[in-house]
Amino acid sequence: MVVTAIRQTSSDRLIVTLDEAEEIKTTLGVVTEHRLYNGAELDDAAAEALRRDSARALARDRALGMVSRRMYSRKELRDKLVQKGEDADTAAYCADWLAEHGFINDETYAAAIVRHYAAKNLGVSRIRMELSRRGISRELWEYALAEMPENDSALERYLRQHLPDPFDLAAVRKVSAALYRRGYSWDDIRTAVEQYSKQYEDF
């Protein structure tokens, strides 16, 4: 195959034409790395490497734009890239490259998720669900959850905000159900309500 044209479309984007037929969208970095020029001859392996490296470079730039706007886990990033039309191998390459260069970090992301949902007074089981949904590996869960504030203080805070009368049984049932949906165990909820009620009795 012969490079019959190299056309620049933006500061870092080019289109390389092979045999006056196949157009490959690529980047300046790839063109430089492959030392392409008009008239350059490529064997099948070199042409395939050009296609692969071009797809990876464009997908990598797309991924960098994505992680500049919000945090992603490796799995989230892979899945999102596939949704946007990248093939699975290219998406996996991008996630690995970004992780290797420090642009994504599942451990840091897990800790951020725990802090975010703990601040919303969510319990451990609900936070575990959020970690799982985002594709965070289980081995990172416990490390991140170890940084979570104690349940007691979060539960007490929630009860103060939502249960003005701890002796109103209907209100207690409603608040208890809400806390269970937030990921707290029934044992933790019952203990917290009892302690909260005792404060009123002592008063």
List each model region and its residues:
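An alpha-helical, amphipathic repeat domain used for nucleic-acid recognition
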Residues: M1-F203
